[in-house]
Amino acid sequence: MKIVADENMPFVEALFGGLGDVVRVNGRSLSAKDLKDADVLLVRSVTKVNQTLLQDCQSLKFVGSATIGTDHIDQAYLKHRGIPFANAPGCNATGVGEYAFIAALELAQREQVNLKDKVIGIVGAGNTGMAAAKCFAAFGNKVLVCDPFKTQDMLYFPLVGLDELIQQADIISLHVPLSDNGPYKTWYLFDEARLESLTPNTWLFNCCRGEVIDNRALIEFKRRRDDIKLVLDVWQGEPHPMAELVPLTEFATPHIAGYSLEGKARGTFMLYQALATSLNLPVKASLQSLLPSHFVNQLGLASQTELTQGQLLSLARLVYDLRDDDKNFRQAFDKTNGFDQLRKNHTHRREFSALTLASSGGCEVNWLTKLGFSGVGR
C-alpha cells in the first residue's frame, strides 16, 4: 500500500509504516503526478483536495486531513468517487485554546494589567473556542460566547450576539470556520465597519482563519487606533501576509496556534484510527507512546499562597514561550518560503498537560489542573 503524506505531518512513519510504504511530499505544491498509484493520502490545510488533484488517481482508498476544518477538501467529489474521508476534529483544540490564554497572559504582563479583570469574548463555540473559554474560566475570567449555531442550553457560558459581545468584552478571540456564503458567512466578519465598532483598548486575537478579518482594513484601522492590541496567528493571503500589518501586532505567529506536539500527534493518530477502521485493521499503536517526556518531569509548588499572574506566566513559559515564535516570525516571514519554513520547523511546543505539578505548600493545584496542567496533589 502506497501512503502519500504531507512532509510536515509528524509520527506518520511510526503509525502508518507498518501498513505500507510512506512517501513524503510538500503539501502546498502537491500535484496529481505525485499521487500516481497512491492508496492513501494524508494532508493538512495547505493542500486543496479536489477533482483536479485526484482525477488521475484511480487506486485511492482513503483521504485523511489532520485538521479540524475541511474547507480545503471537496467532500462531495470524494463521496462521488466512493473514497472514505476522515479529518481530526478537536485534535489541536487544546493547543489553540492555550495559545489564546498564553497570549493574554503575556500581553497582560507587558501592559501591567490584571488579566482576571478582563471580560473575555469568544467568537465561535466549536472545539477551539471552547478550549480557550475553558482556560480563561479556570483562571477566573468572565467569559461570553457568540455562535449563531448554538443555543444557550448547549453552553455553560452566556450566549450573546456579536454586537453585544463587542460592546462588553475586553478581549475578543476569534475561533470560527471560514465561510464565504450563507446567512452567517465569516469571510470578512470583521470588516471596516465592525472594526470601527470595537470599544477603546480592546484586545483582538485571531486564531482561526486570516480572511475572517479584512487585513487591509485592519491596517488602516490600527494606524488610527493604537489603543487596540492585536494578536494574529493567521493572515489573509497566507503564506504571504501583508508586510505592513506585522509591525502593528503585539504578537505575530505563522498559523501555529494549534501546533503543539500533543495536537500534532493527536491529529495523525485520529487518521490512523480512521484508516484502520476503514480497512478493518487492528489498532496496534497508542497516542501516549508517541510523546516524549517533558524536560521538567515534575515541578513542586512551594508557595504558601495562590500563584501570582507573573508566576503563572513563568510556569506557562516552561511549556510554551510565545515570545520565541513572535521573534522568529518577525525575522523571517518576508523571506522566500519563510512562512512555511517556520511552520515546518516548529516542533518544540508542548501543552500544559506535559507538565506535572505537585504542591508542598498552600498553593492549590486544582485550578491549575482545570487550566490543563497535570497534577498529583500534595
UniProtKB/Swiss-Prot annotation:
The keyword Transferase does not apply. Its EC number is 1.1.1.290. One of its GO terms (biological process) is pyridoxine biosynthetic process. It comes from the Bacteria. It is an enzyme of class 1 (oxidoreductase). GO terms for molecular function: 4-phosphoerythronate dehydrogenase activity; NAD binding; protein dimerization activity. It is found in: Cytoplasm. Substrate binds at S45, T67, Y259. NAD(+) binds at D147, D233, G258. Catalyzes the oxidation of erythronate-4-phosphate to 3-hydroxy-2-oxo-4-phosphonooxybutanoate. Homodimer. This is Erythronate-4-phosphate dehydrogenase. It comes from Shewanella denitrificans (strain OS217 / ATCC BAA-1090 / DSM 15013). The lineage of its organism: Bacteria, Pseudomonadati, Pseudomonadota, Gammaproteobacteria, Alteromonadales.
